[in-house]
Amino acid sequence: MTHVVLFHHALGQTPGFHAFADRLRAAGHKVTAPDLYAGATFTDLDEGVAHARSTGFDVVRQRGLDAAADLPDDVVWAGMSLGLMPAQTLAQTRPGARGALLLHGSVPPEALGSPWPSGLPAQVHVMEHDDWGDVDDCRALAAAQDEVELFLYPGAGHLFTDASSVDHDPAASDLLLERVLAFLQRVG
């Protein structure tokens, strides 16, 4: 069993987000899912991003860091889209992580103020033509780090793992989950 700390995307903790977390739990993993939005959820990505913007992206990120303060170090930090900000920050700055799962994009490590940790395994999952997912940043991270695997999926949907999102792609989501579970087995 691996402990996964999963940060939600800009739509908040939607039913599809919870369903994804439950699939990890059903495979035997412990999942902690901090709520960065204090219960708010959205069905439209632009509205969710507007909420994050009005709250302040730094505030949203800090909520994630604060939520992780009392959690153990030997976890897998996972973030979906907006949730990448706290997940990737913690993976890069908090020693002891087992790995990182960067779903629906990634952030250039230098934008978070520190390099990618040597030897830290990670997976990046994004659709090839995702306008929100910064595919070039994902490619650059994987090219620069031997421990980072990049998985590109056909299509343009952003939140394709969220069954309650208009972007949901069941086949891509199932393949992603298969790869994530293999990763968790390997690093656990």
Regions found by a protein language model. Give the residues of each.
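Conserved hydrolase catalytic core segment
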Residues: 89-99, 115
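Short beta-strand/loop motif that positions the catalytic acidic residue
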Residues: 124-126, 153
